C-alpha cells in the first residue's frame, strides 16, 4: 500500500493497522525534517481512509475527488502567502474556520479528515484555539498534524496526539527518484548526499524552485570563487561577481552560502582523506586538487566565516554587504 511513496515502511505499517483498528487515536502528528514526503503520505492515507473499500486505488468518486484536493470530507489547512510570496504563519482566522467546520457531519464518508500542514508554524493564538478543538474532538474526525519539528508545538497539544516520526531515507532511494527527473548518475548521487535523505529537498534543489537557476549553477559560482582565491584585485573581482549584484536575490545568496559551506567542508574531508564523507561526489577530483591549496586551519576558519555570513543573511543583513564582507574575509584569510 502507498507504493508510490518510497521508504517509511514502519510508518506505513502503523497507518495500515490504524485503518482497521477498533479503537484509534483521533489525532496524529507526522514529524520529521522537510521534504520527506509527510504531506504526500498524509493525503494518500486520507484518500484510503475515506475510500469506501479502504484501498485508495482511485477507482471510486471519493478517491478522484481527494486526488484533486476537492473532497467534501477533507479539510486542508496550510500557510498562506503574503504579497511578496513569503509564507505566513497559520493564523487564528484559519483555525476559527476549522472550528466552524467541526459543526458539520461528513458528507460522503463516516469520517472527516483534517490535515494541518506546517503545524509548528501556528501563531500562539491559533495554537491555543486549536487546543480547545483537540480537548473536545468532533465525532468521526481524524486530525493529522504535519511538522518539521515538535519544538514549537505546545506541550499541551503534544500530550493529546500520537507522534509518528519520519526519518531521512537511504541515499540510494533519493538517487533513484532524482534520476527519474532526468539527473545524470553522478549528479544524482551528489543531490542525494546534499539533501541528506530528503527527497523533496533534492528535487527542489535540482529544479531550482523559487530561484533563477538550479543547484549546480550556484555551486559553480561558489566553486569558481574558491578556485580564484587568492584574488589579485579583490575590488575588481567583486564588481564582476554575480552574488554582489543588486539583483541577486536574498534566497539566492542563502543557497550560495550553504553550498560554499558544503564545498569548504568537502575540502576539509579531502585533507583528512575521509572521501566517503564528501557531499559533492560528482566533482571529487576537482575537490582533491583544490584541497592541496589549503591548510586545515584555514579551512576551519573559512567555514566559520561562511557560517557568520549565513547567520547575517538569516537576520536580514543586506545581501551585497554580507557577500562582499565574506568574499574579502576569505581572501584575506587565504593570504595570511
Residue ranges of predicted features:
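A short, hydrophobic/aromatic-rich structural module that often spans a beta strand
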Residues: 123-132, 313-321
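Clamp-loader machinery-focused feature within the broader ASCE/P-loop NTPase space
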Residues: 1-125, 291
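Charged, glycine-rich active-site and insertion segments that engage polyanionic ligands
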Residues: 1-48, 65, 139-141, 149-259, ...
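Conserved catalytic/switch belt of AAA+ P-loop NTPases
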Residues: 128-145
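A short beta-strand-to-loop transition that corresponds to the Sensor-1 phosphate-sensing loop
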Residues: 117-118, 145-150
Amino acid at each position: 500500500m502507498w507504493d508510490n511513496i518510497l521508504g517509511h515502511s514502519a510508518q506505513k505499517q502503523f497507518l495500515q493497522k490504524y485503518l482497521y483498528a477498533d479503537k484509534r487515536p483521533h489525532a496524529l502528528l507526522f514529524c520529521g525534517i522537510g521534504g520527506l514526503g509527510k504531506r504526500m503520505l498524509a493525503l494518500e492515507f486520507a484518500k484510503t481512509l475515506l475510500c469506501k473499500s479502504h484501498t485508495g486505488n482511485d477507482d471510486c468518486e471519493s478517491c478522484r475527488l481527494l486526488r484533486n484536493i476537492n473532497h467534501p470530507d477533507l479539510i486542508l489547512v496550510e500557510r498562506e502567502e503574503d504579497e511578496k510570496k513569503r509564507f505566513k504563519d497559520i493564523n487564528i482566522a484559519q483555525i476559527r474556520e476549522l472550528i466552524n467546520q467541526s459543526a458539520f457531519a461528513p458528507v460522503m464518508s463516516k469520517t472527516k479528515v483534517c490535515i494541518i500542514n506546517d503545524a509548528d508554524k501556528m501563531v500562539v493564538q491559533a495554537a491555543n484555539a486549536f487546543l480547545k478543538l483537540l480537548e473536545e474532538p468532533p465525532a468521526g474526525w481524524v486530525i493529522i498534524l504535519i511538522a518539521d519539528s515538535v519544538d514549537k508545538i505546545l506541550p499541551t497539544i503534544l500530550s493529546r496526539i500520537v507522534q509518528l516520526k519520519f526519518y531521512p531515507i537511504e541515499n540510494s532511494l533519493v538517487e533513484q527518484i532524482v534520476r527519474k527527473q532526468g539527473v545524470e548518475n553522478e549528479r544524482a548521487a551528489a543531490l542525494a548526499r546534499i539533501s541528506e535523505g530528503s527527497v523533496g529537498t533534492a528535487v527542489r534543489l535540482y529544479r531550482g524552485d523559487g530561484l533563477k537557476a538550479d543547484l549546480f549553477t550556484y555551486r559553480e559560482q561558489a566553486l569558481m570563487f574558491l578556485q580564484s582565491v587568492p584574488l589579485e584585485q579583490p575590488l575588481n573581482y567583486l564588481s564582476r561577481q554575480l552574488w554582489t549584484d543588486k539583483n541577486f536575490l536574498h534566497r539566492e545568496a542563502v543557497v550560495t552560502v550553504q553550498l560554499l559551506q558544503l564545498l569548504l567542508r568537502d575540502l576539509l574531508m579531502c585533507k583528512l582523506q575521509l572521501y566517503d564523507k564528501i557531499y559533492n561526489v560528482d566533482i571529487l577530483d576537482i575537490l582533491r586538487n583544490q584541497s592541496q591549496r589549503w591548510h586545515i586551519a584555514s579551512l576551519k576558519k573559512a567555514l566559520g566565516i561562511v557560517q557568520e555570513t549565513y547567520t547575517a543573511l538569516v537576520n536580514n543583513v543586506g545581501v551585497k554587504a554580507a557577500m562582499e564582507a565574506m568574499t574579502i574575509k576569505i581572501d584575506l584569510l587565504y593570504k595570511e
